[in-house]
Amino acid sequence: LLARRDSKRLLVIGTGRQARYQIESHVAVMGLNLQFQVWGRLSERADSVVNEMSKVCSIERVDDLEASARDADIIVTITGSTAPLVLSDWVKPGTHITAVGADAPGKQELEVALVEKADVLVADHIEQCVDHGEISHFVQTDDTRKSTIVELGQVLNNPKMGRRNDSQITIADQTGIAACDIAISQSVLNSW
């Protein structure tokens, strides 16, 4: 729905339990065609993810976040960061980003310029993402920007509201809605 079907490289930024779940879910949906990379502030925690997940997929630890982000087709952020980790200049056309870590006020993983650069900006729940999430930083200076955001449910019901071509940058800001998680899982499994 949002990532290109020909995506080859997936970068996971973060090393907690959720990193493992994200890797497992991408393997389940997209198969083993992806080369996974994991980056974390602590290399030993990234190594732990690699050791555990190498039983499931092809995965490596990376130390150069910028180089890995520049090369990634899909980026998943799942950290507790309060400052941007992924900068706008690092993201190439066609990249999809799922931002999961900014699930509370004050958290931020993406540079605001990157969110501004997105061709498609999707929220699991707009009002919640405006309160806390990557979108909260995006609308902070201009509330009219809310009109450019679509809810994930709208994309699930009408895929044309998601990615329309392979050069678009798409961002999904996921702050956590349980009912949405269930609907997404079912829809993705049905469509892939």
Task: Please provide the spans of the model-predicted regions.
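Adenosine-phosphate binding glycine-rich loop
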Residues: 104-192
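Rossmann-like adenosine-cofactor binding region
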Residues: 56-143
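N-terminal Rossmann-fold NAD(P) dinucleotide-binding loop
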Residues: 19-20
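Conserved beta-strand elements of the Class I
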Residues: 10-11, 170
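Glycine-rich Rossmann-fold phosphate-binding loop(s) that bind the pyrophosphate
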Residues: 14-16
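A structural signal for isolated positions on well-ordered beta-strands in alpha/beta enzyme cores
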Residues: 11, 35-37, 60
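NAD(P)-binding Rossmann-fold cofactor-contacting core
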Residues: 28-53
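Short helix-loop-beta connector
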Residues: 2-9, 32, 92-93
